[in-house]
Curated annotation (Swiss-Prot):
Record keywords, A-Z: Cell cycle, Cell division, Cell inner membrane, Cell membrane, Cell shape, Cell wall biogenesis/degradation, Glycosyltransferase, Membrane, Peptidoglycan synthesis, Transferase
Stored HAMAP family: MurG
Subcellular location, principal: membrane
Membrane topology: Peripheral membrane protein
An example Gene Ontology biological process: cell division
Protein's name in the database: UDP-N-acetylglucosamine--N-acetylmuramyl-(pentapeptide) pyrophosphoryl-undecaprenol N-acetylglucosamine transferase
NCBIfam families in alphabetical order: murG
Length: 359
């Protein structure tokens, strides 16, 4: 069976959908080769994926001075590595998921006349995808109304959604009437610094108001903030678990009644797959503000709540959490709306991939 390259790097948002597609394609009998970079290496720790994985040493070109020169040298080296990978494996197709790691592989794919398709997770077409779209066989998208997509390429669009990893493809049975209320705080694969102060201060207000709930917090924090966040929850006598990354994130979703999170495409796909009611706080300086569009797509479907970072305060967050804690019917109806938004993105994307494989 032919080899398929899956390429994505930089953040978990680019890596995890590639892994999800890899799992589906491997079940269909294809040889999968996952290519990412050193920034994503930590997300592969403790994993047991059976497909091949290559980790490239990429450096951001946003550096200045001697670091910028070093970055260009690394890019040249990555192009040489990409040449060797494509030449030695002769993939039947390349599928990319974003991040500048895709460039050396796509360039060599074009050189060797290997077809490739792009996947856009967000509601706004990213820079790398805009750059290579003219050469792509197709672009698979999460949102039918993806912005920044030139009309001349609309014929290449296939709506598939964003695939999620096998471990996250289930719908938990949550009891929203329970007085044991678990709150999940996630800031994407890299954590979110603002949540380190915003959420504990909102919980402080919650602890001091009159209610009969037992609150548990599971909080993914920026590594440098972990001790501070733990100390805050300990002072409030709140049961908590704080880490910079949860390898068993499926269990955290399964046991949580409400999430507070960013609105990156991977997170959005996960909360839809797991029907997780969530308060979305879009990252305000995401590329082309795509997280705001992602969050509004959820909120407009009454499948979650969007509060922009420029307006959110501990008191506003406290009021929203407190209202939802006391509204099990609203949480249940939100879960139902998310269930209605679920699609089998892994299957749809794998079907699209099979149309373009060179045998």
């Amino acid at each position: 069976m032919k080899t398929i390259f899956l390429v994505g790097g930089g953040t978990g948002g680019h890596l995890f959908p590639a892994i999800a597609l890899g799992e589906e394609l491997q079940e269909r009998g294809y040889n999968v080769y996952l290519i990412t970079d050193t920034r994503c290496e930590k997300y592969l720790l403790n994993s047991n994926y059976s497909f091949k994985i290559h980790i490239m040493n990429m450096v951001s070109i946003s550096n200045t001075g001697i670091k910028k020169l070093y970055a260009y040298i690394r890019i040249l080296a990555a192009c040489i590595t990409g040449f060797k990978l494509v030449y030695s494996n002769s993939p039947g197709l390349i599928v990319t998921f974003g991040g500048y790691t895709i460039a050396p592989i796509i360039i060599n794919g074009i050189l060797f006349k290997i077809p490739f398709i792009l996947h856009e997770q967000n509601s706004v077409l990213g820079l790398a995808n805009r750059l290579f779209l003219r050469y792509a066989k197709a672009i698979t998208v999460t949102f039918a109304n993806t912005l920044n997509l030139n009309n001349r390429y609309k014929h290449k669009v296939i709506v598939t959604g964003t695939p999620v990893r096998k471990a996250l493809r289930f719908t938990p049975k949550r009891n929203f009437n329970s007085k044991n209320f678990q709150l999940l705080v996630i800031g994407g694969s890299q954590g979110t610094e603002i949540f380190s102060t915003l959420v504990p201060n909102a919980i402080k207000l919650l602890v001091n108001c009159d209610h009969d709930f037992k609150i548990t917090i599971v909080h993914q924090a920026v590594a440098k903030d972990i001790n501070y966040v733990k100390a805050m929850y300990t002072e409030l006598n709140i049961e908590h678990e704080v880490s910079d990354f949860f390898y068993n994130i499926a269990d955290k979703y399964k046991n949580s009644h409400l999430a507070i999170c960013r609105a990156g495409a991977s997170t959005i796909s996960e909360i839809i797959s797991l029907c997780q009611p969530a308060i979305l706080v879009p990252y305000p300086i995401s590329a082309q503000n795509h997280q705001l569009f992602n969050a509004k797509a959820i909120a407009d479907n009454k499948a979650g709540w969007c509060i922009e970072q420029s307006t959110i305060t501990p008191h506003i967050l406290f009021e929203k959490i407190f209202t939802l804690m006391q509204s099990p019917t609203l949480l249940a109806s939100t879960e139902l709306k998310l269930r209605e938004m679920k699609i089998n993105a892994e299957n749809l994307l794998a079907n699209a991939v099979e149309k373009f494989i060179v045998t």
